[in-house]
Regions:
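Amphipathic alpha-helical "stalk" segments
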Residues: 1-140
Length: 140
């Protein structure tokens, strides 16, 4: 298997993991067409674009730790965090999504222990709540 084939297989496995973990719930909430379009966007990413997406995800966790130290969701660091997160979501959803859908997704993080665990384990207890507050602040 060459590098390109290995990369395509890795993307397919990543999407399968997403579908196995969140697929049913995501399809019920956002519809098949939306999830299929997101999956198509992910499969169309080049290796460099995929790596940039992964680096952005890691950078969001670092920025969350930095911003959380301010304890101010309106701080410059928190607003940068919000911008980075929105950019990361746009990679998955594409541009032109509705602000209310994005804010609904983010608010949903607080109701889902998987997301709370993900963000809190990356940046400390209360990180998910802080992320949500920072994003809401950026959208006032």
């Amino acid at each position: 298997m060459d590098v390109k084939d290995a990369f395509e297989k890795m993307k397919e496995e990543g999407l399968k993991t997403f579908e196995d973990t969140y697929g049913k719930e995501a399809r019920e909430r956002y519809g098949d067409a939306t999830i299929d379009a997101s999956n198509e966007r992910m499969m169309a990413l080049t290796k460099d674009e995929w790596e940039a997406k992964e680096l952005l995800e890691d950078a969001i966790k670092v920025q969350l730790r930095i911003a959380l130290q301010t304890q101010d969701p309106q701080s410059e660091a928190a607003q940068e965090l919000a911008h980075m997160h929105e950019k990361w979501i746009a990679i998955h959803w594409g541009n032109g999504y509705k602000e209310q859908a994005y804010l609904g997704l983010v608010q949903g993080y607080l109701n889902d222990p998987r997301f709370v665990s993900y963000y809190d384990s990356a940046a400390g207890e209360g990180a998910t709540e802080f992320l949500v507050q920072a994003i809401k602040s950026a959208h006032k």
